[in-house]
Structures are given as C-alpha cells and as structure tokens.
Design a protein with these regions (language model features):
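N-terminal cationic leader/targeting segments used for protein routing and processing
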Residues: 3-6, 15, 61, 70, ...
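Generic structural signal for hydrophobic core residues of well-folded globular domains
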Residues: 23, 74, 78, 94-97
C-alpha cells in the first residue's frame, strides 16, 4: 500500500458520494465550454475532485465499481482537461451514484 495514501484522511462511502456530487455541481456551474478551454479553471475543479478520491484506499473496482469508474474519469479529466467526452462521462457516472 502506498504510504502516502494510507496517511490521507479516509472518507466514508457516503462522504465520497457527497464529494463527487458537490464537484459535479461545480463542473456544471462552470460549464464544460470553460473547463475544456481554460486550464486554470479546469485544474482547480478537476484536481479537487480527483485527488481526494485517488487517496481513498478502499475504493476498488470489485466492491465499488461505479465509484471506481468515477475515480478513473476524474483522473482522466485531471490529466487532459480538453477531453469533453470524458467530462460528460464523469458527470453521467456521478449522477448514477
């Protein structure tokens, strides 16, 4: 286990879902047109969504497949803010939580 991950505060499932929904609201408020073209705006949103999820040691594809997919897409948009399809898929997945 990554020592950095093990020392990061762990959320409950409910807290993780609330975290995702909060950032989905922020994404929608900012708009995908802005987030796919303005690196500064995008990094502020995507990093704050993705990083805490990445640090959750309990999120895995077997026990929490939907939340795991949200994590994958959160990291995807954090790495490539111009990928509009991934932003859209991220929002779609969060809506299913």
């Amino acid at each position: 286990m990554n020592n950095k991950k093990s020392q990061y505060p762990q959320m409950t499932y409910k807290q993780a879902v609330e975290h995702c929904r909060y950032w989905a609201d922020q994404i929608r408020a900012d708009g995908l047109d802005l987030l796919t073209t303005d690196y500064g705006a995008a990094i502020g949103v995507s990093d704050q969504l993705a990083y805490p999820l990445e640090m959750q040691t309990w999120i895995n594809s077997q026990e929490y497949p939907l939340l795991y997919k949200v994590c994958v897409y959160a990291v995807t948009v954090d790495n490539d803010h111009t990928d509009r399809a991934s932003w859209e898929k991220l929002l779609e997945l969060i809506d299913k939580l």
